[in-house]
């Protein structure tokens, strides 16, 4: 007797719900495991699938914004999450925001009533047999986190997210910064933002008085002991940063031949060199405060923040070492991961990873090769980034045009460039869709 094809999906958040939907609509049975309400997490309040635990905004809806473009790609692939969001949208200008309770209820009802989906309300602490999508989120239960660590090695799983802000290279003033490595060791790998004593003191005063974001109840400072926020370091004394990330020694300005009073370094963040992060600037500051204070750094007066610095509880894997761009485990080919634990950041990005993982898990269950989404698409660029960026400095990332495969022609105007990237992405997804 032949066994019917099936896939296990662990977790019914945004990623797991999307994965389950994509699998079921391809005629494959789904065993969907969700531990709520039997065991709740500190962040969830209901037993509904795809519960939005923070904001009700799914961010921009226009395709000239990468967050909007990824939504449109998902619409074209019949995303349950985007369909539910469109159905339960509330006025939000150019953004897509939802009435959170009916949004989650829509997703729950569609999955619970689908003939291919069997829901199991229980906690799993080990990977089941057969094709499986693990989408247990940033608050993965300890038992399963241990299982993931055992699969990937002790260094393969992080328990907090401590990331410095990431900037668009095109927004940096290159008349004020210079390329150099400390003591000229190796290749000149850093952009350096020099500060005078007066500039440093003004920056210091703004930094120590800036507003800090509130931590959630389930977050604890102990997660961050190994990675001090820049504002905490600053409060230990006006000179402290000068012996840390703002140390000027060995970074003489080639334009003047002099050593600045302080230097903020920017490190290349992706292979295309379109993104740079501010070295050592992991922070708890509110996002608006980050923009205000960090734009005081010479050369960053008009900086565009692709991602703000964050420090929060987050279970995520060192994906460049352990995942393929199909969202498959390198250790076990019938095991897929999706959602924030893969290093994608944001509601929609999590759902998008579930969409890709779900399609590929269903293909595996049907004895078909998994597929890699084109890097010219928002979904493909996310999958490529989290599996090809530097493992040493890996931190979660949201959808942005900086991680896309560059256009063949150079377009200076930002709006025109974004439109060209969007046009190419949607043409790619339409062509790619025909192969699925």
UniProtKB/Swiss-Prot annotation:
Cofactor(s) needed for function: FAD
Q: Which domain of life is it from?
A: Bacteria
**What is catalysed by this protein?**
uridine(54) in tRNA + (6R)-5,10-methylene-5,6,7,8-tetrahydrofolate + NADH + H(+) = 5-methyluridine(54) in tRNA + (6S)-5,6,7,8-tetrahydrofolate + NAD(+); uridine(54) in tRNA + (6R)-5,10-methylene-5,6,7,8-tetrahydrofolate + NADPH + H(+) = 5-methyluridine(54) in tRNA + (6S)-5,6,7,8-tetrahydrofolate + NADP(+)
The entry marks the following residues as binding FAD, namely 11-16
InterPro entries the UniProt entry points to: FAD/NAD-bd_sf, MnmG-rel, MnmG-rel_CS, MnmG_N, TrmFO
Query: What Enzyme Commission number(s) appear in the record?
Result: 2.1.1.74
One Pfam entry for this protein is: GIDA
| Any one Gene Ontology BP term | tRNA methylation
Q: Sorted alphabetically, which keywords does the UniProt record give?
A: Cytoplasm, FAD, Flavoprotein, Methyltransferase, NAD, NADP, Transferase, tRNA processing
| One cellular-component annotation, GO | cytosol
> Which EC class is the enzyme in?
transferase
Molecular function, one GO term? flavin adenine dinucleotide binding
Q: Tell me the compartments it is located in.
A: Cytoplasm
User: What NCBIfam families has UniProt attached to this entry?
Assistant: gid_trmFO, PRK05335.1
Q: Which HAMAP family match?
A: TrmFO
Q: What does this protein do?
A: Catalyzes the folate-dependent formation of 5-methyl-uridine at position 54 (M-5-U54) in all tRNAs.
Which family is annotated? Belongs to the MnmG family. TrmFO subfamily.
Identification of the protein by name: Methylenetetrahydrofolate--tRNA-(uracil-5-)-methyltransferase TrmFO
Task: State the encoding gene.
Answer: trmFO
């Amino acid at each position: 007797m032949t066994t019917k094809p099936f896939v296990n999906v662990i977790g019914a958040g945004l990623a797991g719900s999307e994965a389950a939907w994509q699998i079921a609509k391809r005629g494959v049975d789904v065993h969907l495991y969700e531990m709520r309400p039997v065991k709740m997490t500190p962040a969830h309040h209901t037993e509904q699938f795809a519960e939005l635990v923070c904001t009700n905004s799914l961010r921009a809806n226009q395709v000239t914004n990468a967050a909007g473009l990824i939504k449109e790609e998902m619409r074209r692939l019949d995303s349950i999450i985007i369909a539910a969001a469109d159905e339960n949208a509330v006025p939000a200008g150019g953004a897509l925001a939802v009435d959170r309770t009916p949004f989650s209820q829509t997703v729950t009802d569609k999955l619970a009533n689908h003939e291919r989906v069997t829901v199991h309300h229980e906690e799993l602490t080990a990977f089941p047999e057969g094709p499986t999508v693990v989408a247990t989120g940033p608050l993965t239960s300890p038992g399963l986190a241990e299982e993931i660590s055992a699969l990937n090695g002790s260094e393969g799983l992080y328990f907090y997210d401590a990331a410095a802000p990431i900037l668009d290279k095109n927004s940096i003033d290159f008349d004020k910064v210079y390329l150099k490595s400390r003591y000229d060791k190796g290749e000149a790998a850093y952009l350096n933002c020099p500060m005078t004593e007066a500039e440093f003191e003004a920056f210091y005063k703004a930094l120590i008085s800036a507003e800090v974001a509130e931590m959630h109840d389930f977050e604890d400072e102990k997660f961050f002991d190994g990675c001090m926020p820049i504002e905490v370091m600053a409060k230990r004394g006006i000179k402290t940063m000068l012996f840390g990330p703002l140390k000027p020694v060995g970074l003489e300005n080639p334009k003047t031949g002099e050593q600045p009073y302080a230097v903020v370094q920017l490190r290349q963040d992706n292979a295309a060199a379109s993104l740079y992060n501010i070295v050592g600037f992991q922070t708890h500051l509110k996002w608006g405060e980050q923009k205000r204070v960090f734009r005081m750094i010479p050369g960053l007066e008009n900086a565009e923040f692709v991602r703000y610095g964050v420090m929060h509880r987050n279970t995520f894997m060192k994906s460049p070492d352990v995942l393929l761009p199909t969202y498959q485990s390198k250790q076990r080919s019938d095991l897929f991961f999706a959602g924030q634990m893969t290093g994608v950041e944001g509601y929609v990005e999590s759902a998008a990873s579930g969409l890709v993982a779900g399609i590929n898990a269903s293909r595996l269950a049907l004895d078909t090769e998994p597929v890699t989404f084109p890097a010219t698409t928002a979904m493909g660029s996310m999958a490529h980034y989290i599996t090809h960026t530097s493992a040493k400095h890996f931190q979660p990332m949201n959808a942005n045009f900086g991680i896309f495969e560059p256009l063949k022609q150079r377009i200076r105007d930002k709006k025109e460039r974004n439109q060209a990237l969007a046009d190419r992405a949607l043409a790619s997804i339409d062509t790619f869709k025909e192969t699925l």
